[in-house]
Each structure stands twice: as structure tokens, then as C-alpha cells.
UniProtKB/Swiss-Prot annotation:
Alphabetical GO biological process terms: translation
Subunit relationships: Part of the 50S ribosomal subunit.
Protein name: Large ribosomal subunit protein uL15
Keywords assigned: Ribonucleoprotein, Ribosomal protein, RNA-binding, rRNA-binding
GO cellular component: cytosolic large ribosomal subunit
Length: 152
């Protein structure tokens, strides 16, 4: 038998009939319609809004009032401003190791980021994990170069 659009049928059991609630005891969902006896959840206009906790201050309104929530996947950097790089000589290479030797960074736990605060008077080759736009412009304007290091 060939199937045409007017002879197509859905498989039996694939489409469930909608329950007609409140249409008599014989219908199986009469009287209280499966909502129980009394209470807010059995009334008309039933569902409360998402996040409603029965009048108690809901979680989504409590949380911002509490302090010290840690930012998930926060990027931390060991930061240093451009004005500190004036301690180096012309054509020096600035990286985490050289900054530790100079005493500008003590314990390099995090990747290095160069910030653009202050003036730079020295031509340097700076190797860091991140630069601000202003820092990159100032280093290149002083004749230096910026090299990005990959995080491993």
C-alpha cells in the first residue's frame, strides 16, 4: 500500500490525549482534579512564580545582600605599572624573572599583566601574559616592543 499525505497516521501511543480535569468523577480527574484537598497549590491561578518561597525572602533576593561571594573562574594577574619599568636600562628584556630579580614582584603566583599608569622613558622588550591598551601604546611609543606569552 502506498502512503500518501491523506493516509498518514501517527503511531499508536505516540500522541497522548489531554486530560480534561474537573469534568466529573467518571472522568477520573473530577472534584479536586488531582491537586489535593486545600491550600495554595489547589486554588485557581495555581502556579506561583518561579523563585517564590511562600513569602519568605527568596534566595535570589538574599544572595546579593551577602558579601564575599567568590567570582567563579576569576582571572588573577600579578600586575605592574609602567612607571616601575623605568628602573630597567635601554634594550633590556622585561619578564617575570627579571622583575623578581629587581624586587618589583615578590612571589609570581599569577600571570603577569602590564598596566598603563605612569610614563616610560626607556626602550624595553616586555614579555607578559597581558597588556592594557594604554600600556602597549606607551611601550611602543617609547620605541620598545610588547610580546605576549601563552599561559600553559
Amino acid at each position: 500500500m502506498t502512503s500518501t499525505l491523506n493516509t498518514l497516521k501517527s503511531n499508536s501511543g505516540s500522541r497522548k490525549k489531554k486530560l480534561r480535569k474537573g469534568r466529573g468523577i467518571a472522568a477520573g480527574q473530577g472534584a479536586s482534579c488531582g491537586f489535593g484537598m486545600r491550600g495554595q497549590k489547589s486554588r485557581s491561578g495555581r502556579p506561583t512564580r518561579p523563585g517564590f518561597e511562600g513569602g519568605q525572602m527568596p534566595l535570589y533576593r538574599r544572595v546579593p545582600k551577602l558579601k564575599h561571594f567568590e567570582i567563579i573562574n576569576q582571572k588573577n594577574f600579578s600586575i605592574i605599572n609602567l612607571e616601575k619599568l623605568n628602573d630597567f636600562k635601554d634594550n633590556d628584556t622585561v619578564n617575570i624573572d627579571s622583575l623578581v630579580k629587581k624586587g618589583l614582584i615578590f612571589k609570581p603566583k599569577f600571570p603577569l599583566k602590564i598596566l598603563g599608569n605612569g610614563k616610560i622613558n626607556v626602550k624595553l622588550k616586555v614579555q607578559a601574559h597581558a597588556f592594557t591598551k594604554v600600556a602597549k601604546q606607551k611601550i611602543e611609543a617609547a620605541g620598545g616592543s610588547c610580546e605576549l606569552i601563552n599561559n600553559k
